From Swiss-Prot:
Any coiled-coil regions, as ranges: none
Modified-residue entries (N6-(pyridoxal phosphate)lysine), positions: K90
GO MF, one example: tryptophan synthase activity
Protein name according to UniProt: Tryptophan synthase beta chain
Subunit structure: Tetramer of two alpha and two beta chains.
Cofactor: pyridoxal 5'-phosphate
NCBIfam families according to UniProt: trpB
Pfam families associated with the record: PALP (PF00291)
Keyword S-adenosyl-L-methionine applies: no
Gene3D superfamilies in the cross-refs: 3.40.50.1100
Amino acid sequence: MMKVKELPKKFGKFGGQFVPETLMNALIELERQFIQTKEDDEFQEMYRYYVREYSGRPTPLYYAENLTKKLGGGKIYLKREDLNHTGAHKINNVIGQVLLARKMKKKRIIAETGAGQHGVATATICAMFDLECVVYMGAEDIERQALNVFKMEMLGAEVVSVTSGTATLKDATNEAIRDWVANVKDTYYVIGSVVGPHPYPTMVRDFQRIIGDEVKEQILEKEGRLPNYLVACVGGGSNAMGLFYPFYEDEAVALYGVEAAGLGVETDQHAATITKGSMGVIHGMMTYLLQDEQGQITPVHSISAGLDYPGIGPEHAYYHHTGRANYVAITDEEALEAFQLLTRLEGIIPALESAHAIAYLMKLAPKTKGDDIIVLNLSGRGDKDIHTISKLLGGNRDDK
């Protein structure tokens, strides 16, 4: 077998490495080390050990009988990534990258976070391995995700509030990149999604593909065949890519990525990058993004802190461009309704990000046949969003 010398830098015309010269050597070294891990049995075994024993994989593929009956149409299965340690899919990637950082002898870990789930996962693994951890987070997201901020600080991470720009994920990412440029010798940057310069989109996908690999095995065991539809929410897009990628060549399986329509795609208050965006460069990659006529990144909005990102992973851009996946958009209001539906019907409180996927499922399922199979990636649990939701749904209680 020929050894992999380097990975493809682009997905069609998307991806690449649009970064300052100071980072090029770091990216080349990162790719070299990552390729080595693919052929390193000890590294792979260590990764499998921690996702199994520490995070609790494999996560269940749960038949949502009540939801199936309510919506009509095909059988609905939920891939329960909410049952991972720390409450979301993010830890799959963090375990892989922090093991890689240790292999590279890096002592300081930095990360960006929107909803706080990637930040919590990074702080958690750094606590376990006794590594210095700095997490950049937009000031607006800090307010929305107070519980996760407290968790990160409890775990020993320094949370840096970013007040520039829209004070959300894009701005936190900008600050993390600045830190990395300044401290590249001893610092490892754990990117939380399938975004950024090569090799990050490929690395994160490879650490997240465990989701789709498990689904394939589990659905064949339960149903004896592959699903007809896969549905997942998309911000940067790592939970969706983790689900989609192992099914890429199974063309009979339809893929649906669900973006945040915010107050509506006809307004300027949304984060529907593929639905409304155009090609450009953001955070070191060529992809679709939300920009004005001058090429400036436009502000984004979503009720969900994990989806309000003005770009999207380049592999998703490629899937859209080639027609392999379908990308749709769901409003704040629709996501809130879906959040309540799943909570009441199945006793599962989803993250607001995942609620966007549920909301699209509510439109898709009734159009499917009774013997169709739909798998939805429940990317995270909703504990972190209770504060936001109680303000929106129960805002008058304090006044009574």
